[in-house]
Design a protein with these regions (language model features):
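C-terminal and late-domain segments of enzyme folds
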Residues: 217, 244-247, 259-269, 362-451
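Residues that mark the start of a beta-strand
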Residues: 3, 28, 248-250, 276, ...
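ATP-dependent carboxylate-amine ligase catalytic core
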Residues: 2-13, 17, 24-107, 115-141, ...
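Cysteine-nucleophile active-site neighborhood
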Residues: 302-378
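Phosphate-binding active sites in nucleotide-utilizing proteins
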Residues: 240-324
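A short helix->loop->beta-strand "cap" motif at the edges of active sites that frequently abuts
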Residues: 109, 167, 324-328
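Internal gly/pro-rich beta-alpha loop/helix module
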Residues: 121-242
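Structural motif
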Residues: 5, 80-82, 112-114, 144, ...
Length: 451
């Protein structure tokens, strides 16, 4: 089994494109994404046919990170990990700052650095040398240059990089607008929007041409290090007592264009614990699947499907009836929004949603930066866990009776900022935070046993 990590020198360097090309070029790839992003893993699945897992040094301790990596590579030939932001960018300026470099050291994985070569010559060697010297425990084994106008220029830049840094160049990406993907909140389209499309077919052809003509695939594969994939799900002590614990129970997972943000490790944990996962679409289906013990609404883009969600009256009624019958319901971000009364859009349109939580949400034209990023969470049950927030909306009207329904989450960021959020009503829990179950298994057990 081989492993390699693709990082950018900075955001926008081209690491997602390079990762996608390499995932398309090699066979039977186990894809991974550093950090909490949901969109890139969807692309990984498009180009590999395999599920992608998030590797997050903030949400996971080192043993958990290694566990998710080792279980995620089972049966594959090569693990390709896509980084996040720039190689050393994380929280603060310590080297253990939950960055791509931090993850690479935990996993002892070689790094290929993608560098934007636009408008630069010999100075690119100084840039690469700085990355090499900044942390000698990060194994930068190769460089791929992006935005290169010609092979002649690439060879010129390659000479400078290799002469002054001792790190070999492994190829380049030519300037080509067709390599880019349109923006959508987190920076990309959702992968399902491209599935079976002509755009995807053309992109795969282009990726193949670039891989064959511009990248040294043989050397990249040689640089990727061998490692042992010992240990399965049931050998990880924090979850060993969960094996088949909930066998016979059924969880409905909302899955469509409006709700698609799920950590694959969360779903793996559900399957390991014996839960039967049944997917359904609040956009298309007329009612919930039968005999559910838990309904899981992940994040996504309900604002793009507000009309379909609003007009699907029978689905909303089915969800309200499940709530009245005591079925456990858990919602994150977009899923939380769907469980509220109404979503108000910027253009004046609105969607009437489930209304279980007597709250109105309003979209904003910019990121809610005050409540953005990694968060430490303490629940009303004194369970401490971790997650993140990322949303372009906010609560505009809150008619919930606070005497009966205090906020369930106490949030604190590493910089000391804090707030409360989340709504707990009967057997429903929902709020803006996206939560990794592996951050604290007790939270996962709470959803199944005590909610």
């Amino acid at each position: 089994m081989k492993k390699i990590l693709i990082s950018g020198a900075m955001s926008g360097s081209g690491k997602t494109t390079v990762s996608s090309i390499l995932m398309s070029a090699f066979e039977n790839v186990a894809p991974f994404k550093v950090g909490p992003d949901y969109i890139d893993p969807g692309y990984h699945e498009l180009f590999t046919g395999n599920k992608s897992h998030n590797l997050d040094a903030f949400m996971f301790d080192e043993d958990t990170l290694k566990h998710i990596f080792k279980t995620g590579v089972k049966g594959r030939n090569i693990a390709i990990v896509e980084g996040v932001m720039g190689l050393y960018d994380g929280i603060g300026h310590e080297k253990d700052n939950f960055s791509t470099a931090h993850v690479s050291r935990i996993l002892d994985i070689p790094v290929i650095l993608v560098v934007n070569a636009k408008g630069i010559s010999t100075s690119i060697a100084a840039e690469v040398l700085g990355f090499k010297l900044f942390d000698k425990n990060v194994k930068i084994k190769g460089i791929i240059l992006n935005n290169v106008s010609s092979e002649k220029l690439y060879l010129n830049l390659k000479e400078a990089v290799e002469r002054f840094t001792g790190i070999e160049c492994l190829g380049y990406l030519p300037k080509n607008d067709k390599l880019s993907v349109e923006s959508r909140h987190l920076g990309l389209k959702q992968a399902f929007e491209l599935k079976d499309s002509e755009e995807l077919r053309e992109k795969k052809i282009l990726f193949k041409e670039i891989a064959e003509n511009c990248l040294n695939l043989k050397r990249i594969y040689e640089i990727a290090e061998e490692f042992e994939t010992d240990g399965g799900m049931d050998e990880f002590k924090p979850i060993e007592n969960l094996k088949n614990k909930y066998k016979g129970k059924k969880v409905g997972v909302a899955r469509d264009g409006a709700f698609s943000f799920y950590y694959e490790a969360n779903l793996d944990l559900m399957r390991f614990s014996g839960l039967e996962i049944v997917e359904f679409s609040p956009v298309r289906d007329r009612k919930l699947p039968d005999n559910l013990d838990l309904i899981y609404f992940g994040g996504g883009y309900p604002e793009l499907y507000y009309k379909e969600l609003s007009e699907n009256v029978s689905m909303k009624e089915s969800i309200r009836q499940a709530y009245e019958n005591g079925v456990k319901i858990y919602g994150e971000c977009g899923g939380f929004i769907y469980l509220t009364k109404r979503l108000n859009l910027i253009d004046g349109n609105y969607g009437d949603f489930c209304g279980i939580i007597d709250v109105e949400i309003s979209m904003r034209n910019k990121l809610n930066i005050g409540r953005f990023g990694y968060i430490n969470i303490e629940t009303g049950e004194r369970i401490k866990t971790k997650g993140h927030e990322f949303h372009y909306s906010e609560i505009s009207t809150d008619n919930e009776n606070k005497k009966d329904n205090t906020h369930f989450y106490k949030i604190e960021k590493n910089d000391g900022r804090n707030w409360t959020c989340g709504y707990k009503k009967k057997s429903l829990l929902a709020g803006y935070p996206h939560i990794s179950f592996y951050s604290n298994i007790e939270f996962f057990k709470y959803l199944l046993e005590k909610l």
